[in-house]
Amino acid sequence: MRCLPVFVILLLLIASAPGVDAQPKTKYDVPLASRHDFAKKTPKRLSKPRDCCRRNFLCC
């Protein structure tokens, strides 16, 4: 009889826990938009070395 309240509380805790679908993000879960944006920005940086050198002298 003493185990019944403990069993009910455990059932309530298990039912309120998040589902299996909630998975933490890994380093490989990078959105594709950021990769495409980087691919677009790289040629622009290479085509304008003067602007780059004004901001950062190490890129010249």
Curated annotation (Swiss-Prot):
Main location, first listed in the record: secreted
Keyword Secreted in record: yes
Coiled-coil intervals, chain numbering: none
PTM statement from Swiss-Prot or TrEMBL: Contains 2 disulfide bonds that can be either 'C1-C3, C2-C4' or 'C1-C4, C2-C3', since these disulfide connectivities have been observed for conotoxins with cysteine framework V (for examples, see AC P0DQQ7 and AC P81755).
UniProt xrefs under InterPro entries: T-conotoxin (IPR031565)
Residues making up the signal peptide according to the UniProt record: 1-22
Gene Ontology cellular component annotations, sorted alphabetically: extracellular region
Record propeptide residues: 23-50
Domain notes: The cysteine framework is V (CC-CC).
Homology family: Belongs to the conotoxin T superfamily.
Protein name, as recorded: Conotoxin VnMRCL-012
Organism field: Conus ventricosus
